[in-house]
A protein has these predicted regions:
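Extracytoplasmic/periplasmic C-terminal soluble domains
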Residues: 182, 263-264
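Detector for conserved single-position "signature" residues within domains
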Residues: 270
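Membrane-embedded alpha-helical bundles of multi-pass integral membrane proteins
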Residues: 1-244, 248, 255-256, 273, ...
Length: 279
């Protein structure tokens, strides 16, 4: 089962060209939905306007080498390592979901386009990556949904409470869950595999066609926002936020109370000793 290309087996009932056309259509829907989201919300215009305002304030000029370094830091720390999450559990869940999605989607594309039928033998690594990516995604996604979500963990709401903002997460989990169930049933020759194949296609269509109404496009916006934030810190404008911190001697000298002048850097962080579960 873990070494079998489920899409090659599906080609016996659905022509490979139809399967490939469906995948291409989903890619087009993501691109079109993201562009619509950019225009509708004005995200790109906001970033460019913010960039121009930052330069107009006369901050420290940034050279090409420093800009490349900032881009590399953004890619490694903020994107690949999800460095924006200070909560370790939230970061691990996000990384499992993100890398699981990448592996699952990549393996799907390779198996559909490079090995579309049983006549073309599929290397065992691709079905294995498809399963591994799917299981990683489900582990991270369900962990987040039932135990880490702020409205569940900190506000005491039931994990079965669904709002519009949950469209992306729920459709993603539904797509991968139904896909793995379908592949398992198909490998075992179950008659129910056809039903789950239809449900898998439905959930996947909702996931990719619902980009304008979900958080799907945030995966493209967040790297741009992280890069702009690092640039604003480097040129000194810092998005109009204070740049002095408590470890700065000038900031410490401003306090009239001796206690605050010599206070340890971790003073006042007692609120972090216990999770906010007193709902």
């Amino acid at each position: 089962m873990f070494a079998t290309n489920p899409f090659a087996a599906l080609s016996a009932s659905i022509p490979p060209a139809v399967i490939q056309g469906y995948v291409v259509l989903m890619i087009v829907l993501v691109a079109a939905g993201t562009l619509f989201d950019i225009v509708h919300k004005g995200s790109a215009r906001y970033f460019f306007d913010n960039w121009r305002r930052s330069k107009a304030k006369g901050g420290k000029p940034i050279g090409g080498g420093e800009l490349f370094s900032i881009a590399a830091q953004t890619a490694v720390v903020d994107v690949l390592a999800s460095g924006e999450f200070c909560n370790a559990r939230r970061r691990v869940a996000h990384l499992l979901t993100m890398y699981g999605f990448v592996l699952h989607a990549l393996a799907t594309a390779v198996m559909v386009f490079a090995y579309p039928t049983a006549a073309t033998s599929t290397p065992a690594i691709w079905p294995l990556l498809w399963w591994l990516g799917g299981l990683m995604l489900l582990l991270g996604g369900y962990w987040f949904w039932f135990f880490i979500r702020v409205d569940v963990a900190a506000e005491g709401n039931t994990p079965f409470r669904v709002v519009h903002a949950d469209l992306f997460v729920l459709s993603l989990l539904a797509s991968v869950t139904l896909g793995l169930i379908w592949a398992c049933l198909q490998a075992n020759g179950s008659a129910a595999s056809g039903i789950f194949c239809g449900l898998y296609i439905l959930a996947t269509t909702v996931l990719f066609a619902g980009v304008p109404w979900s958080k799907f496009a945030h995966m493209f916006f967040k790297p741009a926002a992280a890069f702009e934030k690092r640039v604003s810190k480097a040129n000194g404008t810092a998005d109009n936020l204070p740049t002095l911190t408590r470890d700065d001697p000038e900031q410490q000298a401003r306090h009239s109370m001796e206690l605050l002048r010599n206070a340890p850097m971790d003073m006042g962080l007692g609120i972090k000793r216990e999770a906010p579960r007193h709902y």
